[in-house]
Amino acid sequence: MGLSTVPGLLLPLVLRALLVDVYPAGVHGLVLHPGDREKRESLCPQGKYSHPQNRSICCTKCHKGTYLHNDCLGPGLDTDCRECDNGTFTASENHLTQCLSCSKCRSEMSQVEISPCTVDRDTVCGCRKNQYRKYWSETLFQCLNCSLCPNGTVQLPCLEKQDTICNCHSGFFLRDKECVSCVNCKNADCKNLCPATSETRNDFQDTGTTVLLPLVIFFGLCLAFFLFVGLACRYQRWKPKLYSIICGKSTPVKEGEPEPLATAPSFGPITTFSPIPSFSPTTTFSPVPSFSPISSPTFTPCDWSNIKVTSPPKEIAPPPQGAGPILPMPPASTPVPTPLPKWGGSAHSAHSAPAQLADADPATLYAVVDGVPPTRWKEFVRRLGLSEHEIERLELQNGRCLREAQYSMLAEWRRRTSRREATLELLGSVLRDMDLLGCLEDIEEALRGPARLAPAPHLLR
């Protein structure tokens, strides 16, 4: 009566028939294809590949940097691999029949070569420092400069594949990765980032002006001050006292130049000294005024620096009738005055008690001052032992009166030197060392005169 059926087989056959009619492709997928079965059976372990002609044979893959020249001839035999040529590479194990060509960095994209191509590695391209990669595809990228965040701060630094992320200051908004002033805000997007009105923008500008203006004024004042100090130190004649205060040193005075009148410093009483040991004045009245000790400062001549003391004239006009003699004749018992001993270094002069300046009168000191040339005076007092500080101090004390300053220097040397050493012989020795023998003779001639008084004061107009 119908087809005989095997128990348990009817139901699967019916289901298969139904599936074939409804889902033919799905049923076909349930049945293994002969080629797939062959591939599954011929799968090789890692590091090997199936022989293209005999799927049952597994050949060893070629190492990176090499390519497949010939397949292995049988199981357990080596594959014939060859090294890649220049300009080609293989970066992993393979069974390629030829190597891959090396890539080249694209200069139009600002790419630079990081490392060259080798047989086992492709060329590595990248960007310069402070640049990042902007990818246009999976492999194509362009190098762009990292943003410096002007008018803002760096929130995230620049990375290899990402630009700098900036955080803009108040009054600025971010547009195209740049912080732009809110003054240029024209659309609704930036207005959300710039809620400030025109008043706040003006406040921001006023804040900048408030900060910069004091700095400009401060640096301007500093520049003017240093310029003023430089001019004061350069042109000392303008303000001598200001120059002394600012520059920390005295105003230099040209030696030999006439100086304005200034009050000379007062010295204590000085006893009269005569370089002629045998001469002594008498008590008889004489019209020639005699020198008295100085007790208070008086006007002193300031323009005698270039005038030397000369010996008195050999002939003196006779006095008027009825007037007594100018100087009385010494008694017969009074010895005749002996001439002033020369300032020499002979044994006789050394043993004959050299004239000491400890008790010298101002006339003797003025004779030395007038005898030494002004251009050599500082050298003269330096040789006597005065320091630069003392010389400058005495110049300042006497204002611009050169002659009184020189007198003060000589008096200072006499004061600080012992009585035994402060002698005319020492001054003469210094003058000889300075090759000023003519000046030495002029001083000796001036000191031999009967009247050794300082010249009359002469006031500058």
UniProtKB/Swiss-Prot annotation:
GO cellular component: Golgi membrane; membrane raft; plasma membrane; receptor complex
Residue positions with a glycan: N54, N86, N145, N151
Entry keyword Repeat: yes
Keyword Membrane: yes
Parts of the chain on the Cytoplasmic side: 234-461
Residue ranges occupied by any Death domain in the UniProt entry: 362-447
Keywords: Apoptosis, Cell membrane, Disulfide bond, Glycoprotein, Golgi apparatus, Membrane, Receptor, Repeat, Signal, Transmembrane, Transmembrane helix
Stretches for region N-SMase activation domain (NSD): 340-350
Extracellular side, ranges: 30-210
Assembly mode: Binding of TNF to the extracellular domain leads to homotrimerization. The aggregated death domains provide a novel molecular interface that interacts specifically with the death domain of TRADD. Various TRADD-interacting proteins such as TRAFS, RIPK1 and possibly FADD, are recruited to the complex by their association with TRADD. This complex activates at least two distinct signaling cascades, apoptosis and NF-kappa-B signaling. Interacts with BAG4, BABAM2, FEM1B, GRB2, SQSTM1 and TRPC4AP. Interacts with DAB2IP. Interacts directly with NOL3 (via CARD domain); inhibits TNF-signaling pathway.
Protein name listed in UniProt: Tumor necrosis factor receptor superfamily member 1A
